[in-house]
Structure formats: C-alpha cells, structure tokens
Amino acid sequence: MEYQDYYKILGVSRDATADEIKKSYRKLARKYHPDVSSEPNAEEKFKQVKEAYEVLKDVEKRKAYDAIGSGWKQGQGFTPPPGWESRPGGEGVRPEFREGFSDFFESLFGGLGQEARWTRQEFKQRGQDQHSRVTVSLEEAFNGSTRLLTLQEPIVDYQTGQVTSKTRQLRIKIPAGVTEGQQIRLQGQGLPGIGGAPNGDLYLEIHLAPHSLFTVEGKDVYLNLPVTPWEAALGAKVSIPTLGGSVDLTLPPGSQTGQKLRLKGRGLPGGTPGDQYVLIKIYIPEPKNDQQKELYQQMAEQMPFDPRKELLG
C-alpha cells in the first residue's frame, strides 16, 4: 500500500494547530466537493481531503499517525510497523463514513467500527535524528575546541494542537582535524524515542569559516606568499605563518610565480595529517626615483631575456 501524507494533503505543517487543520479542511472541501467543483479528479481529491481530516482532527489518531515518523513521502510503499495494534474504546470511524478511504487508512484505523480506538501501546519508535550546522574557525579546526549549542525541540500538545519549543543546551567537543562538510555524530542527542525506544542522534555538519590568510582543500592548507624579484631570483630564507606558528621557509633560486612549495604535515591534523602548500607570487616594486629606474635599465641591458620568445616561434 502507499503512504498517505495527511499534512501535505491538507497543505499544513506537521506542527499545525487544530484550528489551522480545520480551516484548511473546510477550504479544500469546498474546492473539491464533487457537486460544485470543476477540478480534474475532484471526487478523488475530496476523498483524500476527507480522509486526512478524519485522522488529523482526532487527538488519538493524530498522535498515533505522528508516531509513524516524518521520514515517509506521499505515495511511498508502506507496511504498518511491528507492534501496531488496536484497543477497544474511544472514538472510531463508522463504516459508512469510511467509504472510499485508502488501504493505508484501513490498515491503521479501520476494521473495528464505531467503538474502535487505535493506540500506540506496545508500539516503539526510535526518536528522529536531528541535524545542525556548526561554523568553526580554521584555528579551532586545527587545535580542537568546545562549543555550547542551544537546540530547539518542538513539543506538541495533542490535546490542544498547540506547538511549543523546548530549549536545551549541549556542550560539545570539536575534535582537532575536522574538515569542511564533516559530520559529527552525537549518539542519543536527537529527539526522544516513543514507547521506551532509544533517542535519535544529533548530527553536526562542520563548516569552516573563511580565513584571511589560508584556504583549505580537505586537510591541506594553502598560503599565497608574496616575494620580491631578488628573493625569487637569488633565493632567500623567509618566515611564513602556519596554523601551528611561524616557520622558516627556504626559497630556491630562480623561483617563479605560481610555483608551489610543500610543508609536509603542516596542514590539518589527523591520522594522516594534511600538508601546507605555499604558492609563490612575485611582486614588482614600482621605481620611485631616477636611481631606481637606472637599476631597472641596467637589468634590461645586462640580462637580455624575452619571455615571449616562444609565442613568436
């Protein structure tokens, strides 16, 4: 049989109040009533709307329906979960009013007549997982850190249909070496289970904040290094920043813009730590007096060099 998304059919959210559900039902019932509607498949849609309202208007049926979970999609193949059973008593649905209802409805709420009531007794459902995004600095990703998260959990009062939020705080540890998009699983920190079933898990997705000096690819860190023409030509020892502190780097003679130097193990830590790559970019100083212009002129005369030679064949 196919799962019926009653909230989607009525066009309301899962935390809709009883009044919102009733208002939407009345609007859609008028729209699709076969006696007045010119909509295609109006009769079928009217039955779907009627069925959805029959469940969501009733406190116990809605409570039981919600226990199935929100991970299902309209039309998806469905089988009632183990432990789903009926109990006598309470408000049922008279057979004449169930005519045309789906197999999905009948499998969950039909079959016991006017004196039937469906419950969640002995029905267990693992709590839903929650997902959150945490932005950390590159320094935090390198060193590790702790965070105090504030989480909002929806609480539904099935007697009134009102939805409130419960706030809780959770201190978490960000391990050293986390990377962009990595997920941290916190077991049992999701929404509560039903009928004694375990809680869901909380998944934290790591987002690395942009850095003023470094860019990151996986565990590797990249730094653009400005150098002077004479440092590039003659070679030099320069001090550069890394996430673990400053280190000395030797520029080989004849370094070129775009050349990449590797500092092994200076990236983000882990079982196999990343590397830091230094990208050389040569900056040409502008001559500001006649003496400096003369130096450039001497270079042009004493170092004949045509970087466009290959372009001209």
Swiss-Prot record:
User: Which GO molecular function entries does the Swiss-Prot or TrEMBL record give?
Assistant: bent DNA binding; unfolded protein binding
Sorted alphabetically, which Pfam families does this protein's record hold? DnaJ, DnaJ_C
**GO cellular-component term (any):** cytoplasm
Q: Where in the cell is it found?
A: Cytoplasm, Nucleoid
Question: Which top-rank group of organisms is this from?
Answer: Bacteria
Keywords of the record: Chaperone, Cytoplasm, DNA-binding
> Among its keywords, does the record have Cytoplasm?
yes
Residue ranges of every copy of the J domain listed in the record: 5-69
Task: Kindly give the InterPro entries that the UniProt entry links to this protein.
Answer: DNA-bd_curved-DNA, DnaJ_C, DnaJ_domain, DnaJ_domain_CS, HSP40/DnaJ_pept-bd, J_dom_sf
- Stretch list, region Disordered: 71-93
Which HAMAP family does the record match to this protein?
CbpA (MF_01154)
Q: What is this protein called?
A: Curved DNA-binding protein
Q: Which lineage do the record's taxonomy fields give for this organism?
A: Bacteria, Pseudomonadati, Pseudomonadota, Gammaproteobacteria, Legionellales
Gene name linked to the record: cbpA
